[in-house]
């Protein structure tokens, strides 16, 4: 859990959320980031898979009428329907402090489904952040770098030291932002996206 009080306001501010916006949060934990989102957005929907956390969130988020908890697995829930039902035509930003072991699957699901979201601001392990944000053609770039660059413009915002968490992890974290493209920067031959990604992963 994040215990540094300065981190979550920076994440929420970086997401550009304000009046008229919706925020989709993945993994609210005990609600530290959630509270900052609720102070800025018209509505915040948090997806949480851990069934132990709803009682805690019910207490920590009691004063926020614009908060809704969805007890689901973000990799399985129907995100398109959820976004349409909860946010309508509001601009939506995604914010999350992602578990390191599941960073890529969650990000790629959010991007590959071409959901109506403006940006994704997440905290991940620093090494993962560097891979996700590596420019295509550089030595650091890998398949995930090319995949992310197809769907969004990534940037590394700031790093977060282990002491900002309890318990403290053994690695440094980083906050990144993916500004989702309205149209991809390249067009696959014959519009074959699946073929393009097979080539990327080869």
Sequence positions of predicted segments:
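Catalytic cores of RNA-modifying enzymes
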Residues: 1-202
